Amino acid sequence: MIPYKQLSLADIFQDCQNKFNNDKPAFLSLLETHIDIDEFIPISFRNHFYASTGRSRKYPLRAFLWALIIQRIFSIPTDQLLLTFLVYSKPLRDFCGFTKVPDASKITRFKQDFLDDLQLVFDKLVDITEPICQAVDSAKADMTIFDSSGIEAFVTENNPKHANRIIRHLKAYAKANSFDKNYDPYKAAYGSMPSHASANPEIKQLYINGHFCYVFKFGIITNGLGIIRHIAFYNKNFIASHPDITVEKKSDSPDEDKSVHDSRLLIPTLKDFFLKHPLINPKTFLGDAAFDTAALYPKLLTGNTFGDHKHFDKAYIPLNSRAGLEKQDYTINENGIPCCPHDDSLPMKYEGISKLRSGVTRYKFVCPKIKWIKNVSTGRSQRHCTCDDPCTASSCGRMVYIYPEKDLRAYPGAIRGTEEWNNTYKIRTTVERDINHIKDNLCLAGRRTQNEKTLHADLILAGITQLITVVLSDKINHHEFIRSLKPLIA
């Protein structure tokens, strides 16, 4: 006989509650358990949002933040689609903290009205995640990598047909007038296009990833782990706060214009970064050949550019092919390594670093044709030059000492072409992958707006989402998810 059990209202309620808790998506439960969004909201943001004047808030601050972060974690491309998910998903709605789903205008107004406050949330998360990055890989965490890109605005000029029509006409014109093969219709098209969009002069023309576009330009600083440390939005406010930046008219070369502009933006961007985060003190800088200018190296590697005695020890920047190194009484190859005076294709051997009593560092290079031969009587090995046509009377062969302080561009704290240089410089591509990640996966690309504040807020929210990812991966002790939570969602 099956024993019966009297069901009470409390039992029924408990069963329903257990069913509800078990049905909650595991990823949302993970966020709810390990992330307290209130810890990252500065009191000034809270006071601004819940100001004593004006109407009372129907929707809580944390609900807006969670909704916009969830949108980027799940790669939901539009705000309207996010709101649709909130309407049909009660667990998602309850997790965010909405009792009623706001309309799209509320989301847009939140981004525009609280842009500066979102920046404070991002800056606070940078400081919180720095110890985590140091614990994961201190060597990569001590690297600073910079690159620039742009957010394409929703303007007529970004329609591919706009540029293709101009290029097609120029090709036909060149063919009709029998121009020679040196004529480049793409450069000619770049020169003939307006420097900014007709809808907004702040939307500038840029050449990114092989195509012309009209964008709001931004700069991004990451560490060697690919974690964002700083975001700079290059609008008129940024230019006004850095009057030393000179803005010149564009030339006929899009690549040259981007390189020149990037090199002028680097130092102001780094100054802002170090000013906001005085406790972060990286020692290694990585950048592409756009930053290979003689004026930049002393600012990066010496003096008080970023604070009292605060500068980088090494700068991994490849030499620009358009500007070679100054030649001394010996020849120098493209990596800054002295070559044999009788054979330019034969680089000398790098034999290490030594310091004088004064503390000055010098690099030692020796003849590539020397051999170490052991003296039987003394038991010691000595250098012997085996060259058939020696350039010096010394039996040890030619030796060259390089003093990097005299030429920081040629010797920026490391020797180009060495295994150390090649292995370290490979890490620079993390910033490019990071830019692609925030555009494609964190919903920065394809935004159907030309409003500067909205796009700026979207950029900051992408950075906030990545840093939330870092915090969560540390809380659950899975640092392999430090850059993306997609495996956890799946």
Can you name each region flagged by the protein language model?
Residues 1-45, 476-490:
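Charged, often Cys/His-bearing segments associated with DNA-binding zinc-finger transcription factors
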Residues 27-70, 74:
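Basic, short loop/linker segments at the boundary and entry of helix-turn-helix/winged-helix-like folds
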Residues 35, 86-87, 329-366, 404, ...:
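Short amphipathic alpha-helical "interface-anchor" segments enriched in bulky aromatics
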Residues 80-95:
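DNA-recognition alpha helix
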Residues 150, 174-191, 329-397:
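Low-complexity, serine/threonine/proline-enriched polar segments
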Residues 423-490:
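Basic, amphipathic alpha-helical segments enriched in Lys/Arg and hydrophobic/aromatic residues
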